[in-house]
Amino acid sequence: MFSVFEEITRIVVKEMDAGGDMIAVRSLVDADRFRCFHLVGEKRTFFGCRHYTTGLTLMDILDTDGDKWLDELDSGLQGQKAEFQILDNVDSTGELIVRLPKEITISGSFQGFHHQKIKISENRISQQYLATLENRKLKRELPFSFRSINTRENLYLVTETLETVKEETLKSDRQYKFWSQISQGHLSYKHKGQREVTIPPNRVLSYRVKQLVFPNKETMNIHFRGKTKSFPEEKDGASSCLGKSLGSEDSRNMKEKLEDMESVLKDLTEEKRKDVLNSLAKCLGKEDIRQDLEQRVSEVLISGELHMEDPDKPLLSSLFNAAGVLVEARAKAILDFLDALLELSEEQQFVAEALEKGTLPLLKDQVKSVMEQNWDELASSPPDMDYDPEARILCALYVVVSILLELAEGPTSVSS
C-alpha cells in the first residue's frame, strides 16, 4: 500500500499530467529536494529507475560569467504560473483468498476511505531560459560531489514542479486483516487506524526534468527530446530508463537475483549478521534512516574505504572481508534491500511485527504464494505491458522478508 503522501502525489500526476512525463515525489522527506534548477541523478535499480538528489544546482557547475548568471537565474524561473485544486474521494473494500497445498488457507480483507482536498501551484523554468543552456561552459573547479557522480548514470535538470500552496493535512482511514488457517495452528495480522500526514507549504509533489549532456569536461548541453547518454565519452554507459518499471521478464529473473543476494550474505559471521540485521531493522518505517544508510553504503561502494568515525560503522564494516577488501556484491545486496524497502509503506509494519514475533518464515510463504499468482498473470501479458505497481510492491515485500530471514537464521559459514 502507498503512503498517504505518495497516494496524493500519484493523484496529482494522474490529474495534471495523465500520460505525460511528470514524476511523483514518493516521500515527504524528498518534498524539498526536487526544485527547479536542481540537478538529479538517475539510479538504475532492480525495481526500475528512480531519481535521487545530488545536492547540486546549475549555479554549482556552470561558469557564472560575472554577475550575468545571477540575473539569468532570477529571470529563468517564471514563478507561480497557476494554481489548481484537486479533490479525491475514495471508499473501497476488497477480499483475498489463497489456498495452498497441505491444508493451508490464506485469507485477507481490507477497507479504506479517504477524502483529500489539496491546492497546488505550478512553477517552471521558461523555455527561453532553457534555450540558453546550449553549449554552456562549466566551472574550471567543479564540486567534488559532481566529480564523484557515476558517469554511467544520467543527470537531469528539474524544469517544472507542482507544489503545495499552503499547509495541508491529509487523512486516510484503513483497516487490514490477514490470517492463515494451518493444520497445526494459525497466524493473523490486523491493523486498524487513521493515517495522517501534514505537508508544509511550498513542498514539491511532482516534477518534470530535462536531460543534461556533457560532451566533454568543459561544456554542457540540454537535451530536449528522447534519451541519450549524459556522459557520451563513457564507453560503458547505461541507457536511460526514465518512466520504466519492473517488467514480466524481470519478475521471472527476480528469483535468481534474490538467490544472489542471499548467497553473498551467507558468508557473514554471526556477529556481522546481527550488525547488519539490526541496522536494516532500524530502517523499517523510518525513511530518513533508510536514506541516510543508503547514502553511506553508496559512498563506501564508490570510495572502497571505511571511515572509522562513521556512525553506521558496524554495518559498513561488514561490507569488507577479513583482509579489509570491500566486497562489492555485499554492498550492492544491501542497496538492493534498501531499494526494495523504498517500494513499501504500511507493509513495513507487517514485516516489523513478523521479525519481532519470529514469524518471518510463514510471512515469506504467504507472500510467495500470492506473488507467484501475479507472475502467472504477467506471463500471459504482452511483453511491453507496464508492470502492475501493486505486483511490484509484492515483489519488494518478498525481497525484504527473504533478506531479513536470511540474516536472522544464522550463518552457514564463517569465511569472513
From Swiss-Prot:
Region spans: Triggers pyroptosis: 1-280
Transmembrane regions listed in the UniProt entry: 83-101, 102-125, 167-183, 184-198
Keyword set, alphabetical order: Cell membrane, Coiled coil, Cytolysis, Cytoplasm, Isopeptide bond, Lipoprotein, Membrane, Necrosis, Palmitate, Transmembrane, Transmembrane beta strand, Ubl conjugation
Tissue specificity of this protein: In the gastrointestinal tract, expressed in proliferating cells, including in the basal cell layer of esophagus and in isthmus/neck of stomach.
Example of a GO cellular component annotation carried by this entry: plasma membrane
Effect upon mutating residue 21 to A: Decreased interaction with S.flexneri IpaH7.8
Effect of residue 171 to A/E: Decreased ability to trigger pyroptosis
Cross-link (Microbial infection) Glycyl lysine isopeptide (Lys-Gly) (interchain with G-Cter in ubiquitin): where in chain: 177, 190, 192
Up-regulation conditions: Expression is induced by interferon-gamma (IFNG). Overexpressed in inflammatory bowel disease (IBD).
Result when mutating residue 399 to D: Does not relieve autoinhibition. Relieves autoinhibition
Effect of residue 174 to A/E: Decreased ability to trigger pyroptosis
Record-annotated site: Cleavage: 91-92, 220-221, 229-230, 244-245
Region spans: Disordered: 229-250
GO biological process: one example: programmed cell death
UniProt key word Lipid metabolism: no
Impact reported for residue 50 to A/E: Decreased ability to trigger pyroptosis
An MF annotation (GO) of this entry: phosphatidylinositol-4-phosphate binding
Effect of residue 124 to A: Decreased interaction with S.flexneri IpaH7.8. Abolished ubiquitination by S.flexneri IpaH7.8
InterPro entries: Gasdermin, Gasdermin_pore, Gasdermin_PUB
Effect of residue 250 to G: In a breast cancer sample; somatic mutation
Residues forming coiled coils: 248-276
Anything else known: Long terminal repeat (LTR) of endogenous retrovirus HERV-H with reverse orientation may serve as alternative promoters of GSDMB gene. GSDMB may be used as predictive markers of cervical lymph node metastasis and may help, with a panel of other genes, to discriminate between primary tumors of oral squamous cell carcinoma that metastasize to cervical lymph node and those that do not metastasize.
Domain characteristics, as noted in the entry: Intramolecular interactions between N- and C-terminal domains are important for autoinhibition in the absence of activation signal. The intrinsic pyroptosis-inducing activity is carried by the N-terminal domain.
Protein name in the entry: Gasdermin-B
Organism ancestry: Eukaryota, Metazoa, Chordata, Craniata, Vertebrata
